[in-house]
């Protein structure tokens, strides 16, 4: 049995060919054997196939004697939070996040919301399912419904001093995913006026797949910000583990610049803490962390690596330019809700707009944003780039792909973990012309 839905960090595949209820039940049985004793938290996103997949997964777990705590329709971070908060043995979120319509998937964690990825149990689960030893009888253990979100909401609100918040006008675009439900529950506790875009959860995704990185999806948020004169805008993906920001002019803010901003917000509350960041773009983050009295810690990108490094370093915050933001008190997990609350607090307390907060940073360290290249021979393409710049003796780092520092500019080039792509990021020290030149130069070399 080939199981293409099992990836390095999660399970993702087409329904029903690569992921279906029979497979979900078998995954439940195999997962039960991987976890310590205790209940398992299950939740699902708005996709039409998700409730049935969760029910099948639950049946497999309960047939193996596992009590299941069903938290229902939710975001991925709610499964992480409840797994830790309820001291469960593990948790599974049934979601395909921003993947195409016909996809679904699962994100799995063990106790304390620790990720289950390829080398920490996911491939062992795959092998058990593939060996066809994961058949199960009738469910014997109980399933309990727990849809009370009070503890989660209180935790989110604990990150900000509500007495300092101003009556901001915020555009919120849930993309017909699950984020709108949480915004509505938070709204009575906050002084903000919300302009709701694509707000209702709808697994048919009438306004397109909730992926704010797609230009057509950005346009709706940007347009609403400008039309309503909002202070800033926020858009989420389907399971709202990532959030994206737009300033009051409707301009999309590159995720890189949010990492330094959020680091400073957290360090103001927890002085001297460590901040974990990825190697793709670094100069702005390092400077902002150090200016705030924190200690920057470099780590390979990817949630499993960031969370592990944060735990070993006792870091207060971790940020990736891909809009994943991790918080120590949130079980070291990523949240798409905590960041916008912190940014709203920062805007309120500083009296400055989001545009103003990031503009100087964007001028000081302009970046290319991540550019993807489909290449037939990745090694040969990278070799061309390194041969071209080798005589300039850059400072090299191999934490994640290749990072090359030339003093006034740097680049990171890495292979995608999930697709046949090379990903390029370039930044300079305040030189937009140099950025354009070097980005074009490397792009030409990669294309051969």
UniProtKB/Swiss-Prot annotation:
Binds 1 Mg(2+) ion per subunit. Its EC number is 5.4.2.2, 5.4.2.8. InterPro entries: A-D-PHexomutase_a/b/a-I (IPR005844), A-D-PHexomutase_a/b/a-I/II/III (IPR016055), A-D-PHexomutase_a/b/a-II (IPR005845), A-D-PHexomutase_a/b/a-III (IPR005846), A-D-PHexomutase_C (IPR005843), A-D-PHexomutase_C_sf (IPR036900), A-D-PHexomutase_CS (IPR016066), Alpha-D-phosphohexomutase_SF (IPR005841). It catalyses: alpha-D-glucose 1-phosphate = alpha-D-glucose 6-phosphate; alpha-D-mannose 1-phosphate = D-mannose 6-phosphate. This is Phosphohexose mutases. Pathway: Nucleotide-sugar biosynthesis; GDP-alpha-D-mannose biosynthesis; alpha-D-mannose 1-phosphate from D-fructose 6-phosphate: step 2/2. The lineage of its organism: Bacteria, Pseudomonadati, Pseudomonadota, Gammaproteobacteria, Lysobacterales. SUPFAM superfamilies: Phosphoglucomutase, C-terminal domain, Phosphoglucomutase, first 3 domains. Belongs to the phosphohexose mutase family. Mg(2+) binds at residues 97, 237, 239, 241. Its cofactor is Mg(2+).
């Amino acid at each position: 049995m080939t199981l293409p839905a099992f990836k390095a960090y999660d399970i993702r595949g087409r329904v029903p060919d690569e992921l279906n209820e029979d497979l979900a039940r078998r995954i439940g049985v195999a997962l039960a054997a991987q976890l310590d004793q205790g209940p398992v938290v299950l939740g699902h996103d708005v996709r039409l196939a998700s409730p049935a997949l969760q029910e099948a997964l639950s049946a497999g777990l309960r047939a193996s004697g596992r009590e299941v705590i069903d938290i229902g329709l939710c975001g991925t971070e709610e499964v992480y939070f409840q797994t830790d908060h309820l001291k469960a043995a593990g948790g599974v979120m049934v979601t395909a996040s921003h993947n195409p319509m016909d996809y679904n998937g699962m994100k799995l964690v063990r106790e304390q919301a620790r990720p289950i990825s390829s080398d920490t149990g996911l491939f062992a689960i795959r092998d058990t399912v593939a060996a066809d030893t994961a058949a199960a009888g009738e469910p014997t253990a109980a399933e309990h419904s727990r849809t009370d979100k009070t503890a989660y909401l209180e935790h989110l609100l604990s990150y900000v001093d509500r007495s300092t918040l101003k009556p901001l006008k915020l555009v919120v675009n849930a993309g017909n995913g699950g984020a709108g439900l949480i915004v509505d529950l938070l709204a009575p506790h906050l002084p903000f006026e919300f302009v709701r875009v694509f707000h209702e959860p709808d697994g048919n995704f009438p306004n397109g797949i909730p992926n704010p990185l797609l230009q057509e999806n950005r346009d709706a948020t940007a347009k609403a910000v400008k039309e309503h004169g909002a202070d800033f805008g926020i858009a989420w993906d389907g399971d709202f583990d990532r959030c994206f920001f737009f300033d009051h002019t409707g301009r999309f803010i590159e995720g890189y610049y949010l990492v330094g901003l959020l680091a400073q917000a957290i360090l103001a509350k927890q002085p001297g803490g460590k901040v974990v960041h990825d190697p793709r773009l670094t100069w702005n983050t390092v400077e902002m962390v150090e200016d705030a009295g924190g200690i920057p810690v470099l780590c390979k990108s990817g949630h499993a690596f960031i969370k592990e490094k944060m735990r070993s370093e006792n870091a207060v915050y971790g940020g990736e330019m891909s809009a994943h933001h991790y918080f120590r008190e949130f079980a070291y997990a990523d949240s798409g809700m905590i960041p916008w609350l912190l940014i709203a607090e920062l805007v309120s307390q500083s009296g400055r707009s989001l545009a103003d907060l990031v503009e100087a940073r964007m001028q000081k360290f302009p970046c290319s944003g991540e550019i993807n290249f489909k290449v037939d021979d990745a090694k040969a393409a990278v070799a061309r780039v390194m041969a071209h710049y080798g005589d300039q003796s850059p400072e090299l780092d191999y934490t994640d792909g290749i990072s090359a520092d030339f003093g006034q500019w740097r680049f990171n080039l890495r292979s995608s973990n999930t697709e046949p792509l090379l990903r390029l990021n370039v930044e300079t020290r305040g030189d937009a012309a140099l950025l354009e030149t070097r980005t074009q130069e490397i792009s030409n070399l990669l294309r051969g």
